[in-house]
UniProtKB/Swiss-Prot annotation:
Name this protein carries in UniProt: Ribosome maturation factor RimP
Cell compartment(s), UniProt: Cytoplasm
Record's keyword terms, sorted: Cytoplasm, Ribosome biogenesis
Gene Ontology CC annotations of this record: cytosol
Gene3D superfamilies the UniProt entry points to: Ribosome maturation factor RimP, C-terminal domain, RimP-like superfamily, N-terminal
Record bears the keyword Cytoplasm: yes
SUPFAM superfamilies documented for this protein: YhbC-like, C-terminal domain, YhbC-like, N-terminal domain
Organism: Serratia proteamaculans (strain 568)
Family: Belongs to the RimP family.
Amino acid sequence: MGLSTLEQKLTEMLSAPVEALGFELVGIEFIRARQSTLRIYIDSENGINVDDCADVSHQVSAVLDVEEPITVAYNLEVSSPGLDRPMFTAEHYTRFLGDEVSLVLRMAVQNRRKWQGIIKSVDGEMITVAVEGKDEVFALSNIQKANLVPHF
């Protein structure tokens, strides 16, 4: 997925501190708005609880206070990826081969920006998704947002 320069910088800066606490840094979203939000998704083999989020929030806040990579006021949110897990990297798509994903593209493909289908394959920076019985190929750099589709 095409991360912004700031999101890439934050991912590089915060991966080690999050991993030092025993968690995987799943991804980072920075939402610019009147009140901006820095959202950090973490995970572990044992799942995530509120105390885990608080520990990571404390550690990340300390790093951000020193490095000051964000120049505007923002709220910091730390959470688990949830059932509709966001997808950020080629590795995420590989991990969830065969699962259903919802995509929002930066640039339309076949006059569509929204797609939903089964993840079939990952080849470098390209993914193949089976949509209504037809394989569609998307560049990760063209994916603005991607989430797993939970089934109950």
